[in-house]
């Protein structure tokens, strides 16, 4: 049984939603990145979604773009990102860990070499943000060879054709967008309709995680009540990092408190 499946089963038994933080590896440095990730895990993260820094992250808003640039400025290599992931895996054996990255990084490394490296590092899933699902077949085949779950983004206006295609390839969970566009720009986060959630579930039985604009407990509870299994939160955490670049202790303390607060919001009694 996969780590994702075990995690979702456990959370279902506990009547909790899933809280998945997103940060960019190497922001603001590899050393601090490791401390930040460990803080997230120790204060309630049920799984991790980690960004591999890229110079032109089209799906990301300004907050995450700046995080990528800070990481790239440190000249961390692709392999160093995987080494950090391996360190986390060795310490947290049962934690689901996924990465989000862009296709150029995969092509430059070689598709087969990339997925082999994911396997070696102990990764559970890969989300390639800019590969259309119609072009995913070669990635999917090799991902399956190495037991790497393929994660797909599902927008709130997805039609039957897209939902059908996602159902063919998706494994682990489905990443539901709160709204169209890029991450972290608009303050308004759409509450996904129960009708839309039920429509997705007709095509796929995978757990659903809502992302884009998640930053407070009320949003998390609304998301779970709408029928999702939990949330992914990135920009709000990275904003804490950016505001405390020269105050490391304050940064870690704020991340600790924020993570605990958001995880606590997943534990309300669901009707």
UniProtKB/Swiss-Prot annotation:
Pfam family membership, one: Trp_syntA
Chemical reaction(s) catalysed: (1S,2R)-1-C-(indol-3-yl)glycerol 3-phosphate + L-serine = D-glyceraldehyde 3-phosphate + L-tryptophan + H2O
Keywords: Amino-acid biosynthesis, Aromatic amino acid biosynthesis, Lyase, Tryptophan biosynthesis
Subunit structure of this chain's protein: Tetramer of two alpha and two beta chains.
Protein name, entry field: Tryptophan synthase alpha chain
Alphabetized InterPro entries for the sequence: Aldolase_TIM, RibuloseP-bd_barrel, Trp_synthase_alpha_AS, Trp_synthase_suA
Pathway in which the depicted protein is active: Amino-acid biosynthesis; L-tryptophan biosynthesis; L-tryptophan from chorismate: step 5/5
Function: The alpha subunit is responsible for the aldol cleavage of indoleglycerol phosphate to indole and glyceraldehyde 3-phosphate.
């Amino acid at each position: 049984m996969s780590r994702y499946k075990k995690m979702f089963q456990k959370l279902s038994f506990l009547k909790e939603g899933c809280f998945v933080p997103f940060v960019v590896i190497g922001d603001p440095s590899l050393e601090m990145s490791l401390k930040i990730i460990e803080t997230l895990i120790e204060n309630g993260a049920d799984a991790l979604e980690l960004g591999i820094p890229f110079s032109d992250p089209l799906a990301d808003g300004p907050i995450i773009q700046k995080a990528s640039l800070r990481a790239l400025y440190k000249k961390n290599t692709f392999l160093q990102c995987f080494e950090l992931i391996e360190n986390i895996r060795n310490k947290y054996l049962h934690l689901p860990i996924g990465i989000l990255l862009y296709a150029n990084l995969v092509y430059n490394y070689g598709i087969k070499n990339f997925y082999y490296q994911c396997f070696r590092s102990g990764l559970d899933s890969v989300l390639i943000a800019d590969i259309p699902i119609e072009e995913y077949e070669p990635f999917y085949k090799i991902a399956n060879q190495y037991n790497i779950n393929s994660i797909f983004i599902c927008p709130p206006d997805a039609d039957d054709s897209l939902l059908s295609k996602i159902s063919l390839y998706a494994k682990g969970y489905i990443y539901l967008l709160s709204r169209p566009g890029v991450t972290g720009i608009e303050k308004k986060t759409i509450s996904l309709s129960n009708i839309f959630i039920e429509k997705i579930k007709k095509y796929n039985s995978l757990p659903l995680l809502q992302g884009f604009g998640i930053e407070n407990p009320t949003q998390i509870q609304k998301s779970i009540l709408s029928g999702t299994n939990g949330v992914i939160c990135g920009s709000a955490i990275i904003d804490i990092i950016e505001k405390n670049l020269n105050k490391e202790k304050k940064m870690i303390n704020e991340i600790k408190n924020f993570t605990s607060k958001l995880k606590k919001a997943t534990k309300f009694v669901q009707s």
